[in-house]
């Protein structure tokens, strides 16, 4: 593992996340925060993610064809999850006919003063994505 640069390994995991593995979004977000100066603890976390990948090689995205498009979305946030900055991480996931079509996990730009405010900020980001996906789906259907 010493021959593989930390940033390259995180980048490879990020590629998997973007292409086929939304379950890696939170882990990539945390690992990438320490890319400039990883310590042994960060390497251990990276190895843990790689072991997870090894044990879940058959996981991936699955799409089904259906007559009507059904878009379902989920959003969540952790209030003040970053101990140093007290900023929250919010995320969302959207499924179209059961298959993931959009997902994101991102540290919020502002500090939420309550868990309710935190959840509303996450919901706002998810709603913007839902509107875009709805318009896109309608245009695709013609």
From Swiss-Prot:
It comes from the Eukaryota. One of its GO terms (cellular component) is extracellular region. A motif (RxLR) lies at residues 48-51. It is found in: Secreted; Host chloroplast envelope; Host nucleus. Transmembrane segments: none annotated. Keywords: Host nucleus, Secreted, Signal, Virulence. The keyword Ribonucleoprotein does not apply. CDD domains: RNase_HI_RT_Ty1. Secreted effector that completely suppresses the host cell death induced by cell death-inducing proteins. Has the canonical translocation RxLR motif, but lacks the canonical EER motif, which characterizes most oomycete effectors identified so far. PANTHER family: GAG-POL-RELATED RETROTRANSPOSON, PEPTIDE SYNTHASE GLIP-LIKE, PUTATIVE (AFU_ORTHOLOGUE AFUA_3G12920)-RELATED. Belongs to the RxLR effector family. This is Secreted RxLR effector protein 161.
